[in-house]
Amino acid sequence: PTRRSSDLDKARFPDLGKLAADLKAEGIRLVPIIDAGIRCDDNDPVCREGLEKGYFCTKEDGTPFVAAVWPGKAYFTDFLRPEARAWFGRQYKVLTDLGIEGFWNDMNEPALFYSPERLKAFFENAAALSRKDNLDQNDFFGLVRSVMGLMNAPEDYRSFYHDTTAGRVRHDRVHNLYGGCMTRAAGEAFQTLRPSQRTLLYCRSSIIGAHRWGGIWLGDNHSSWSQLLANIQMMPAVQMCGFLYSGADLCGFSEDTKIGRAHV
């Protein structure tokens, strides 16, 4: 409904609660997507509170780590900390108060489009190359690799930290825990926000054991026979790990997505 964390887009969704209720009456449940990144926005009270209380992951020098996702530059909640999980979980209240009963946690590996530092270095390199009127293969393919290397760069995952009871831990060493801890933040919050009620929750990134808080789906895939086979093989595997609620984008949503293939 919005790219900010604390409010709804009233122009597009003037009465989101009524929309959810009307859809439910038609047998359709509204399931909003919740991303891990919180937009860098000084006017957003959720963002300000997260900064003031130190709930976000930090760089080696202790300043908040920033990288871009869908809303642009964002901070990332330190889900390994119980108090940060509790704080993030409370943010679902704006939606549960509207009668929304299901949530889709996404981009929670966390996915990173780029970091400001790496983007600046890319533009500086591109500017230098732009002054040439003849790029050789090394220049050209180096530029291509640098574009592709902006997303989910290992260097970025090595550049921020979590605060734990055992001390500061660099993110890349606990990367696989992050999505599962976001799942836990939401699942534990729903015990308070929607007591004695069932809440649909599924996530793109998770860990074994997080099935006690929510389900999982197998993430983004291509519309190809090889990835369809991979999904068929993976779903029983995650179910054997406890994720009885699991699924996949069976028809895919990139490459050859003709409707006839989906019907097969």
Each PLM stretch: what is its role?
Residues 1-261:
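Catalytic-domain carbohydrate-binding cleft regions of carbohydrate-active enzymes
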Residues 264:
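Calmodulin-binding IQ motif helices
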